């Protein structure tokens, strides 16, 4: 799903980071999820997804309705 979106080196690095059994860092995953799930509902709603780019930079644009469908 990420092929063609992320650089191959980034994908390989991410997979290498959790290649060994029991090495997946769920705390890091949920930390990132919590940043996007701004209302802490346990879901990422469309309105939160629209602001996804702003998690990287406050000045980033909001995604359009078409981009979040």
UniProtKB/Swiss-Prot annotation:
The keyword Calcium applies. Is regarded as an important allergen. The keyword rRNA-binding does not apply. Belongs to the parvalbumin family. Keywords: Acetylation, Allergen, Calcium, Metal-binding, Muscle protein. It holds the Pfam family EF-hand_6. Residues 24-59 form the EF-hand domain. In muscle, parvalbumin is thought to be involved in relaxation after contraction. It binds two calcium ions. It comes from Merluccius australis australis (Austral hake). InterPro entries: EF-hand-dom_pair, EF_Hand_1_Ca_BS, EF_hand_dom, Parvalbumin. Ca(2+) binds at residues 37, 39, 41, 43, 45, 48. This is Parvalbumin beta 4. GO terms for molecular function: calcium ion binding. GO terms for cellular component: cytoplasm. The modification N-acetylalanine is found at residue 1.
